[in-house]
Amino acid sequence: MGRSDIAIVIPAFNEAETIYEVACDVEKYGDVLIVDDYSTDGTRELVETTRATLLSHKSNLGYEASLSTGIKYAVENDYRYIITTDADGELIHFGIEGVVKFLKEGCLLVVGKRNKKNRMIEVLFGFLTFCVFRIQDPLCGMKGYNADIYRKYGFFDNRKMIGTELLAYSIRDNVAIQETPITVIKRKGESRFGGSFSSFIKISRVIFLFFGIAFKRKTA
């Protein structure tokens, strides 16, 4: 069997409880690339027992940097499509089928749409982006990209925008974006957003930056 044209990028930091199951769960959809962000709980060692490609940071660089590392690797290694998902097991991965479908049909960017969100600030962000741009869940960890969209901008997320910066630029430039429903379950382990107060501050900052980029489409 030849190499897949789909790379599935999974950022992981201290996800030993779920990483093996997640890696095995998604490998039927494409080649799995796991970016270990200097975990200390054995995540890396568990990844080495799977068929996934392991990319490792030498220090803890954060969620956005992990996604950027994986996506850059996928593009440099000539994968046509890149799908991101989280390592915590929260996202039910049969939702990847919808992402793959839209990518294969020619969509440049596909955004997952979760059936529930954990925080009111996430609900607010989604409400605002839906009202203005008809995108309901910009913070969903499952997204799909044609590699050409990365090449167009040359970066993924340089502003620590929880993986939404490339989406914001795509909205600004009227890139065709498709949403697909994703089912979630209660996550295991610590949230990528941190505690309730820190997540409120972090997401509020992202909302400000996101609209600062994307809303230029409306005022140009």
Spans of model-derived segments:
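Cell-envelope/extracellular polymer assembly enzymes that use nucleotide-activated donors
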Residues: 5-7, 165
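Short, well-formed alpha-helical segments that are part of the catalytic scaffolds
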Residues: 9-28
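Acidic helix N-cap motif at the loop->helix transition within catalytic regions
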Residues: 17-21, 41-50
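A conserved acidic beta->alpha catalytic loop
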Residues: 36-44, 89
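Conserved donor nucleotide-binding strand/loop of the catalytic core
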Residues: 44-77
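Conserved catalytic loops of nucleotide-sugar-dependent glycosyltransferases that act on lipid-linked
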Residues: 66-67, 117-219
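Short beta-strand-to-loop acidic/aromatic patch adjacent to the donor-nucleotide binding site
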Residues: 79-90
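Conserved donor NDP-sugar-binding/catalytic core segment of glycosyltransferases
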Residues: 97-119
